[in-house]
């Protein structure tokens, strides 16, 4: 099966329309062939096995309407949750993140640091290694996630 960004976008939109109020689709991705993995979060409760099973039963018909008949996996975004929208960066101001950008910024593509400020077009990251600040536009981010220090 060939997966295009447009198809994944259509499936993501179908999932978002079907999700109950207070539930957010954090990320959708294809993994291991026809397995559609949905990372969801919700207000006011855990993303446990029972909740994930309920979400599968809710979104499966919407995905079938879009022509998707493969397997569906629903999971919590986890401790190192992806940041896929500007609202995620705003929510986690002051937290440590790892960011990859498509085009180099200041000669590099990978950054680890603390989100200092968020604006409409991007955010400012205080780098872990030297405390310098770098401004990164949202449009250049190819991957970002919380970076928890599990040794603490």
Swiss-Prot record:
Which BP terms in the Gene Ontology apply to this protein?
A: ribosomal small subunit assembly; translation
* Keywords, in A-Z order: Cytoplasm, Ribosome biogenesis
Q: Localized where?
A: Cytoplasm
Q: Which InterPro entries match?
A: Ribosome_maturation_RimP, RimP_C, RimP_C_sf, RimP_N, RimP_N_sf
Q: Which domain of life is it from?
A: Bacteria
Q: Which GO terms describe its cellular component?
A: cytosol
Annotated protein name in UniProt: Ribosome maturation factor RimP
Species annotation:
Rubrobacter xylanophilus (strain DSM 9941 / JCM 11954 / NBRC 16129 / PRD-1)
Instruction: Please name the gene that encodes this protein.
Output: rimP
């Amino acid at each position: 099966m060939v997966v295009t960004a447009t198809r994944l976008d259509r499936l993501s939109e179908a999932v978002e329309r079907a999700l109950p109020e207070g539930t957010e689709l954090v990320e959708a991705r294809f993994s291991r062939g026809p397995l559609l993995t949905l990372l969801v979060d919700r207000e006011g409760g855990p993303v446990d096995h029972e909740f994930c099973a309920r979400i599968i039963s809710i979104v499966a018909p919407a995905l079938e309407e879009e022509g998707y008949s493969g397997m569906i996996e629903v999971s919590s975004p986890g401790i190192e949750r992806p940041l896929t929208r500007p609202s995620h960066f705003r929510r986690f101001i002051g937290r440590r993140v790892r960011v990859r950008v498509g085009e180099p910024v200041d000669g590099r593509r990978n950054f680890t640091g603390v989100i200092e400020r968020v604006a409409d077009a991007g955010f400012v990251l205080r780098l872990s290694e030297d405390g310098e600040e770098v401004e990164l536009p949202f449009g250049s981010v190819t991957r970002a996630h919380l970076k928890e220090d599990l040794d603490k």
